[in-house]
Protein backbone atom coordinates (compact mmCIF):
# COMPACT_ATOMS: atom_id res chain seq x y z
CA UNK A 1 0.00 0.00 0.00
CA UNK A 2 2.85 2.41 0.75
CA UNK A 3 3.67 2.51 -2.96
CA UNK A 4 0.24 3.98 -3.71
CA UNK A 5 0.14 7.50 -5.10
CA UNK A 6 -1.98 9.75 -2.88
CA UNK A 7 -3.36 13.07 -4.14
CA UNK A 8 -3.90 15.86 -1.61
CA UNK A 9 -6.02 18.84 -2.56
CA UNK A 10 -5.24 22.10 -0.77
CA UNK A 11 -1.69 20.89 -0.17
CA UNK A 12 -0.29 24.28 0.85
CA UNK A 13 -2.84 24.93 3.60
CA UNK A 14 -2.66 24.05 7.29
CA UNK A 15 -4.34 20.69 6.85
CA UNK A 16 -3.17 19.66 3.39
CA UNK A 17 0.49 20.38 4.10
CA UNK A 18 0.36 18.30 7.28
CA UNK A 19 -1.42 15.45 5.48
CA UNK A 20 1.38 15.52 2.89
CA UNK A 21 4.05 15.40 5.59
CA UNK A 22 2.42 12.50 7.40
CA UNK A 23 1.95 10.50 4.19
CA UNK A 24 5.60 10.98 3.23
CA UNK A 25 6.67 9.80 6.68
CA UNK A 26 4.63 6.63 6.10
CA UNK A 27 6.40 5.99 2.80
CA UNK A 28 3.59 6.94 0.44
CA UNK A 29 4.15 8.67 -2.87
CA UNK A 30 2.34 11.99 -2.73
CA UNK A 31 1.13 14.66 -5.08
CA UNK A 32 -0.40 17.90 -3.89
CA UNK A 33 -2.48 20.52 -5.63
CA UNK A 34 -2.26 24.27 -5.30
CA UNK A 35 -3.51 27.36 -7.09
CA UNK A 36 -0.26 29.15 -6.24
CA UNK A 37 3.00 29.43 -8.15
CA UNK A 38 4.88 26.14 -7.96
CA UNK A 39 8.62 26.11 -7.20
CA UNK A 40 10.92 23.92 -9.28
CA UNK A 41 11.38 20.40 -8.00
CA UNK A 42 8.13 20.50 -6.07
CA UNK A 43 5.69 17.59 -5.72
CA UNK A 44 2.83 20.03 -6.32
CA UNK A 45 0.69 20.46 -9.42
CA UNK A 46 -1.38 23.48 -10.37
CA UNK A 47 -5.17 23.15 -10.17
CA UNK A 48 -7.81 25.85 -10.52
CA UNK A 49 -10.77 24.47 -8.61
CA UNK A 50 -13.04 27.28 -9.74
CA UNK A 51 -12.62 26.39 -13.42
CA UNK A 52 -11.61 22.74 -13.14
CA UNK A 53 -8.34 23.40 -14.96
CA UNK A 54 -5.72 20.80 -14.05
CA UNK A 55 -8.00 18.30 -12.29
CA UNK A 56 -7.57 15.58 -14.92
CA UNK A 57 -3.78 15.85 -14.93
CA UNK A 58 -3.64 15.98 -11.13
CA UNK A 59 -5.54 12.70 -10.84
CA UNK A 60 -3.46 10.85 -13.42
CA UNK A 61 -2.35 7.45 -12.00
CA UNK A 62 -3.59 8.39 -8.52
CA UNK A 63 -4.70 5.59 -6.15
CA UNK A 64 -6.13 7.56 -3.23
CA UNK A 65 -7.25 11.16 -2.73
CA UNK A 66 -8.09 13.71 -0.06
CA UNK A 67 -10.73 16.18 -1.23
CA UNK A 68 -11.55 19.55 0.28
CA UNK A 69 -13.03 22.87 -0.77
CA UNK A 70 -10.62 25.69 0.10
CA UNK A 71 -11.70 28.84 1.95
CA UNK A 72 -13.30 31.48 -0.23
CA UNK A 73 -16.06 29.39 -1.81
CA UNK A 74 -19.58 29.34 -0.38
CA UNK A 75 -20.88 26.85 -2.97
CA UNK A 76 -18.62 23.99 -1.99
CA UNK A 77 -20.63 21.51 -4.05
CA UNK A 78 -19.60 23.17 -7.31
CA UNK A 79 -15.96 22.75 -6.26
CA UNK A 80 -16.20 19.20 -4.92
CA UNK A 81 -18.55 17.51 -7.38
CA UNK A 82 -16.08 17.49 -10.32
CA UNK A 83 -13.45 15.97 -8.00
CA UNK A 84 -15.82 13.25 -6.83
CA UNK A 85 -16.86 12.48 -10.39
CA UNK A 86 -13.24 12.23 -11.52
CA UNK A 87 -12.41 9.98 -8.56
CA UNK A 88 -15.35 7.76 -9.52
CA UNK A 89 -14.29 7.68 -13.17
CA UNK A 90 -10.83 6.52 -12.14
CA UNK A 91 -12.19 4.09 -9.52
CA UNK A 92 -9.83 5.25 -6.78
CA UNK A 93 -9.08 2.86 -3.94
CA UNK A 94 -10.01 5.39 -1.25
CA UNK A 95 -11.38 8.93 -1.04
CA UNK A 96 -11.51 11.05 2.11
CA UNK A 97 -13.68 14.16 1.94
CA UNK A 98 -13.50 16.96 4.50
CA UNK A 99 -16.63 19.04 5.04
CA UNK A 100 -17.58 20.60 8.39
CA UNK A 101 -19.42 19.85 11.60
CA UNK A 102 -23.15 20.12 10.96
CA UNK A 103 -22.82 19.63 7.20
CA UNK A 104 -25.34 16.80 7.42
CA UNK A 105 -28.01 18.92 9.14
CA UNK A 106 -29.79 19.42 5.81
CA UNK A 107 -29.53 17.52 2.53
CA UNK A 108 -29.76 20.81 0.62
CA UNK A 109 -26.53 22.41 1.87
CA UNK A 110 -23.62 22.44 -0.61
CA UNK A 111 -21.39 20.38 1.67
CA UNK A 112 -24.11 17.77 2.27
CA UNK A 113 -24.83 17.48 -1.44
CA UNK A 114 -21.15 16.67 -1.96
CA UNK A 115 -21.24 14.13 0.86
CA UNK A 116 -24.26 12.41 -0.65
CA UNK A 117 -22.61 12.29 -4.06
CA UNK A 118 -19.58 10.57 -2.56
CA UNK A 119 -21.73 8.21 -0.48
CA UNK A 120 -23.56 7.13 -3.64
CA UNK A 121 -20.42 6.87 -5.80
CA UNK A 122 -19.66 3.23 -5.06
CA UNK A 123 -16.15 4.20 -3.90
CA UNK A 124 -14.53 3.33 -0.61
CA UNK A 125 -14.70 6.60 1.31
CA UNK A 126 -14.67 8.46 4.59
CA UNK A 127 -16.15 11.84 5.42
CA UNK A 128 -14.50 14.00 8.07
CA UNK A 129 -16.51 16.82 9.65
CA UNK A 130 -14.27 18.91 11.92
CA UNK A 131 -15.41 21.48 14.43
CA UNK A 132 -13.94 25.01 14.29
CA UNK A 133 -10.14 25.10 14.02
CA UNK A 134 -7.91 26.51 16.77
CA UNK A 135 -5.61 27.68 13.99
CA UNK A 136 -8.15 30.34 12.96
CA UNK A 137 -6.79 32.40 15.85
CA UNK A 138 -3.30 32.55 14.33
CA UNK A 139 -4.58 33.11 10.78
CA UNK A 140 -8.06 34.46 10.00
CA UNK A 141 -8.67 36.21 13.35
CA UNK A 142 -5.08 37.25 14.07
CA UNK A 143 -5.26 40.86 12.83
CA UNK A 144 -7.33 42.08 15.80
CA UNK A 145 -4.92 40.37 18.20
CA UNK A 146 -1.98 42.15 16.58
CA UNK A 147 -3.58 45.58 16.24
CA UNK A 148 -5.71 45.78 19.39
CA UNK A 149 -4.84 42.81 21.56
CA UNK A 150 -8.36 41.53 21.02
CA UNK A 151 -10.22 38.62 19.51
CA UNK A 152 -12.99 40.46 17.67
CA UNK A 153 -15.89 38.17 16.75
CA UNK A 154 -19.71 38.02 16.97
CA UNK A 155 -19.54 34.79 18.96
CA UNK A 156 -21.26 35.71 22.23
CA UNK A 157 -20.27 33.45 25.10
CA UNK A 158 -20.81 30.27 23.13
CA UNK A 159 -18.66 27.29 23.94
CA UNK A 160 -16.92 25.45 21.11
CA UNK A 161 -15.19 22.10 20.79
CA UNK A 162 -12.30 23.61 18.83
CA UNK A 163 -9.96 21.15 17.12
CA UNK A 164 -6.30 21.53 16.20
CA UNK A 165 -5.69 21.21 12.46
CA UNK A 166 -2.80 18.84 13.19
CA UNK A 167 -5.34 16.40 14.61
CA UNK A 168 -7.61 16.90 11.61
CA UNK A 169 -4.71 16.08 9.29
CA UNK A 170 -3.71 13.03 11.33
CA UNK A 171 -7.26 11.66 11.18
CA UNK A 172 -7.40 12.24 7.42
CA UNK A 173 -4.03 10.55 6.86
CA UNK A 174 -5.06 7.56 8.94
CA UNK A 175 -8.37 7.15 7.09
CA UNK A 176 -6.69 7.59 3.70
CA UNK A 177 -4.33 4.73 4.36
CA UNK A 178 -6.72 2.14 5.78
CA UNK A 179 -10.04 0.58 4.88
CA UNK A 180 -10.78 -0.26 8.51
CA UNK A 181 -13.46 2.45 8.83
CA UNK A 182 -14.62 2.51 5.21
CA UNK A 183 -17.91 4.18 4.29
CA UNK A 184 -18.24 6.03 7.59
CA UNK A 185 -18.53 9.72 8.43
CA UNK A 186 -16.83 11.12 11.52
CA UNK A 187 -17.57 14.35 13.35
CA UNK A 188 -14.26 15.28 14.98
CA UNK A 189 -13.61 17.73 17.79
CA UNK A 190 -11.07 18.76 20.35
CA UNK A 191 -11.06 17.40 23.91
CA UNK A 192 -12.76 20.33 25.64
CA UNK A 193 -15.46 22.98 25.35
CA UNK A 194 -14.11 26.52 25.64
CA UNK A 195 -15.44 29.99 24.90
CA UNK A 196 -13.52 32.83 23.30
CA UNK A 197 -12.64 34.40 26.65
CA UNK A 198 -10.89 31.16 27.57
CA UNK A 199 -9.01 31.17 24.27
CA UNK A 200 -7.93 34.78 24.89
CA UNK A 201 -6.68 33.83 28.36
CA UNK A 202 -4.69 30.92 26.95
CA UNK A 203 -3.04 33.15 24.34
CA UNK A 204 -2.27 35.67 27.09
CA UNK A 205 -0.62 32.96 29.20
CA UNK A 206 1.42 31.68 26.26
CA UNK A 207 2.64 35.09 25.11
CA UNK A 208 2.78 37.18 28.27
CA UNK A 209 0.60 39.74 26.49
CA UNK A 210 -2.84 40.91 27.58
CA UNK A 211 -5.27 39.46 25.04
CA UNK A 212 -9.03 39.78 25.51
CA UNK A 213 -12.16 38.77 23.67
CA UNK A 214 -14.58 41.47 22.55
CA UNK A 215 -17.92 40.62 21.02
CA UNK A 216 -18.72 42.69 17.95
CA UNK A 217 -21.79 42.97 15.76
CA UNK A 218 -21.99 40.67 12.73
CA UNK A 219 -22.25 43.75 10.51
CA UNK A 220 -18.91 45.00 11.84
CA UNK A 221 -17.16 41.76 10.95
CA UNK A 222 -18.90 41.66 7.58
CA UNK A 223 -17.64 45.15 6.72
CA UNK A 224 -14.13 44.18 7.79
CA UNK A 225 -14.19 41.05 5.65
CA UNK A 226 -15.38 42.98 2.60
CA UNK A 227 -12.76 45.71 3.08
CA UNK A 228 -10.04 43.05 3.25
CA UNK A 229 -11.09 41.66 -0.12
CA UNK A 230 -13.28 38.71 0.88
CA UNK A 231 -15.99 38.09 -1.77
CA UNK A 232 -19.45 39.21 -0.67
CA UNK A 233 -20.96 35.72 -0.93
CA UNK A 234 -18.23 34.14 1.17
CA UNK A 235 -18.41 36.93 3.76
CA UNK A 236 -22.13 36.20 4.09
CA UNK A 237 -21.29 32.51 4.55
CA UNK A 238 -18.81 33.31 7.34
CA UNK A 239 -21.37 35.46 9.15
CA UNK A 240 -23.99 32.73 8.81
CA UNK A 241 -21.84 29.96 10.27
CA UNK A 242 -20.66 32.22 13.10
CA UNK A 243 -24.35 32.75 13.83
CA UNK A 244 -24.73 29.00 14.29
CA UNK A 245 -21.66 29.00 16.55
CA UNK A 246 -23.17 31.79 18.67
CA UNK A 247 -26.36 29.75 19.08
CA UNK A 248 -24.35 26.86 20.53
CA UNK A 249 -24.30 24.55 17.52
CA UNK A 250 -20.53 24.03 17.88
CA UNK A 251 -20.68 23.13 21.59
CA UNK A 252 -19.80 19.55 20.72
CA UNK A 253 -17.02 17.23 21.80
CA UNK A 254 -16.67 13.51 21.18
CA UNK A 255 -14.10 10.74 21.27
CA UNK A 256 -13.65 10.18 17.55
CA UNK A 257 -10.11 11.57 17.34
CA UNK A 258 -8.99 9.25 20.11
CA UNK A 259 -10.94 6.37 18.55
CA UNK A 260 -9.14 6.76 15.21
CA UNK A 261 -5.68 7.87 16.36
CA UNK A 262 -5.49 5.94 19.65
CA UNK A 263 -4.36 9.11 21.44
CA UNK A 264 -5.99 12.15 22.97
CA UNK A 265 -6.56 15.21 20.76
CA UNK A 266 -4.52 18.36 21.24
CA UNK A 267 -5.99 20.80 23.77
CA UNK A 268 -6.05 24.58 23.99
CA UNK A 269 -2.98 24.90 26.20
CA UNK A 270 -0.67 23.01 23.85
CA UNK A 271 -2.09 24.82 20.82
CA UNK A 272 -1.46 28.25 22.37
CA UNK A 273 2.07 27.36 23.47
CA UNK A 274 2.98 25.82 20.11
CA UNK A 275 1.78 28.89 18.17
CA UNK A 276 2.81 31.64 20.59
CA UNK A 277 5.15 33.25 18.06
CA UNK A 278 2.18 34.00 15.80
CA UNK A 279 0.90 36.54 18.34
CA UNK A 280 4.19 38.15 19.40
Give the label of every model feature segment:
Residues 40-50:
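Active-site regions of enzymes building and remodeling cell-envelope glycoconjugates
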Residues 11-12, 32, 219-280:
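A hydrophobic C-terminal alpha-helical subdomain
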Residues 2-29, 36, 50-52, 60-63, ...:
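Oxidoreductase cofactor-interface core, primarily capturing Rossmann-like NAD(P)-dependent enzymes
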Amino acid sequence: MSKDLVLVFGATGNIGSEVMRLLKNEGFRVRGTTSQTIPKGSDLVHVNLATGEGIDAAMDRVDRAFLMSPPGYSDQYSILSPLIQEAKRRNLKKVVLMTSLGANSSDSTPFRRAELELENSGLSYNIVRPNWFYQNFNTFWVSGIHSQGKILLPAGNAQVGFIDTRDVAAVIEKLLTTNQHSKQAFDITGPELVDHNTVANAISSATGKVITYQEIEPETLFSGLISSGVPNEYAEFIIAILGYLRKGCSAVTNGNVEFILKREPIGLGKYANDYRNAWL
